[in-house]
């Protein structure tokens, strides 16, 4: 009877385990964030650390308490901005209750609290997802005060950015006494670092604003601009434009940010204050905390997705992370583990992939860049085919395997992946079969397991 290693990864809200035969113990490595990144960068509890940071925020010459005293007007709400259902929201469920308690203690009326869900261009959350985002108590107690951003409703126009991006944001931001984004910073595959300023754009921006900003990521020859990469911010035209937009918005709306870094579900870093300064500070920490330097690429990488396994669009983050860890010689395989209960997750992504499904890979890539990735033609979702195709191009067609419950025929026909899970199989059985098959032909190869799409692997 075959024994299996302890390698727990996510399958939707479940944890699956026991799929790497123990005979490959010496060749298998579970990729975790560096050990130091698991140690909190503060003393005491999260609440104690947060309260200290509120007293001495970045970029402000007064405390949060004094800011509320100066800016709050009855009938003009304190608006907390939080992530949507596509994110784990470990930080939201901890920080938001503390902040609500805090503003109530500062004589903010309970009816003057609003919670704005920063959906960006994602679908609106279902009411059943509010608990996942906010926790049971807050989602129930403040149900009537929760607002979901809708990017297709006309926003408030505040001019153009220096790069010519029209700036339109959710009207609730302009009704606020103070806008309080609560974020967690992570590496991002084209914005460099997510969190902080991205809670404004794309978080609460209109579709028109996002579709003018995001095409700045593309390069006709390379697919993506060289500066648009995990951890890249200095020469990144997308994030540079967003920074500029936030700086302009700050002159019209009082914004006080709360940022965290979460490692393996626990908050290990907290800072507060000016949103742009928070972004710059978080970048210095997150790159160190999420970068793994390894001497050799793996033959096979198993990539769990955590909450990003909800659809193929979001699962692309885990695929991208695995791409950095796998061999690029046409012999390595990525096993992307994502149930995909919401299917593809983006209509534009779906349209572009179906339109180019029969084209050779390079022809399809160039066609998409020419016809769907200009400022005139770009729609949110059009960037994902470019990323998928450059990954497939580098690892080899047929080497991106998908373990999913979604329509295998469509995945195979249109999305440049090889769906390998049979309907009657469990994901564990599929992984056992795929790993055993690969290793029987490549017995000396390394196996990497990852369950964190925010990891940045560098092969030295």
Range-by-range predicted roles:
Residues 111-121, 334-339, 399-405:
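Short internal beta-strands
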Residues 27-72:
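An N-terminal, well-structured beta->alpha segment
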Residues 76-89, 114-121, 301-305:
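Short glycine-rich or small-residue beta-strand-to-loop segments that form or flank ligand, phosphate
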Residues 223-308:
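Membrane-embedded hairpin module used as a gating/binding unit in multi-pass transport
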Residues 88-108, 315-327:
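Histidine-anchored nucleotide/phosphate-binding helix
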Residues 1-35, 397-460:
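Extended hydrophobic packing segments that form well-structured cores
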Residues 125-194:
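An acidic, phosphate/nucleotide-engaging active-site surface
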Residues 312-400:
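C-terminal catalytic subdomain
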């Amino acid at each position: 009877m075959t024994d299996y290693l302890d390698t727990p990864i996510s399958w939707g809200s479940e944890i699956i385990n026991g799929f790497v035969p123990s005979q490959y113990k010496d060749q298998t490595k579970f990729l975790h964030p560096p050990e130091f990144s698991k140690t909190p960068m503060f003393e005491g509890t999260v609440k104690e650390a947060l309260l200290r940071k509120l007293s001495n925020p970045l970029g402000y010459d007064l405390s949060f308490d004094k800011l509320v005293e100066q800016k709050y007007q009855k009938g003009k709400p304190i608006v907390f901005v939080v992530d949507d259902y596509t994110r784990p929201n470990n930080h939201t469920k901890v920080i938001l209750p503390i902040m609500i308690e805090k503003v109530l203690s500062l004589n903010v009326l309970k009816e003057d609290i609003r919670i704005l869900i920063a959906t960006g261009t994602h679908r609106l959350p279902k009411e059943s997802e509010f608990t996942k985002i906010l926790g049971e108590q807050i989602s129930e107690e403040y149900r009537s005060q929760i607002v979901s951003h809708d990017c297709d409703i006309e926003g408030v126009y505040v001019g153009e950015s220096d790069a010519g991006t029209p700036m339109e944001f959710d009207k609730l931001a302009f009704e606020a006494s103070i806008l309080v984004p609560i974020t967690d910073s992570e590496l991002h595959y084209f914005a460099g670092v997510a969190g902080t300023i991205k809670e404004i754009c794309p978080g609460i921006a209109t579709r028109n604003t996002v579709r003018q900003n995001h095409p700045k990521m593309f390069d006709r020859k390379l697919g993506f601009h060289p500066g648009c990469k995990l951890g890249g911010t200095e020469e990144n035209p997308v994030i540079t434009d967003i920074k500029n937009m936030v700086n302009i918005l700050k002159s019209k709306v009082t914004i006080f940010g709360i940022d965290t870094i979460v490692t393996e579900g626990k908050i290990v870093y907290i800072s507060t204050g000016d949103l742009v300064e928070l972004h710059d500070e978080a970048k210095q920490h997150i790159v160190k905390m999420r970068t793994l330097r390894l001497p050799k690429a793996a033959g096979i990488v198993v990539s769990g997705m955590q909450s990003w396994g909800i659809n193929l669009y979001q699962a692309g983050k885990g695929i991208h992370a695995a791409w950095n860890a796998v061999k690029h010689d046409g012999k390595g395989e990525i096993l992307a583990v994502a149930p995909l209960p919401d299917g593809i997750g983006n209509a534009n992504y779906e349209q572009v992939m179906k339109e180019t499904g029969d084209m050779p890979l390079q022809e399809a890539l160039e066609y998409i860049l020419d016809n769907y990735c200009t400022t005139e033609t770009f729609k949110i979702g059009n960037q994902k085919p470019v990323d998928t195709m450059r990954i497939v191009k580098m690892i080899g067609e047929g080497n991106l395997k998908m373990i999913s419950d979604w329509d295998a025929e469509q995945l195979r026909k249109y999305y440049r992946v090889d769906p390998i899970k049979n309907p009657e199989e469990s994901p564990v059985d599929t992984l056992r079969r795929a790993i055993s098959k690969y290793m029987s032909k490549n017995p000396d190869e390394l196996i990497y397991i990852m369950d964190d799409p925010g990891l940045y692997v560098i092969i030295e």
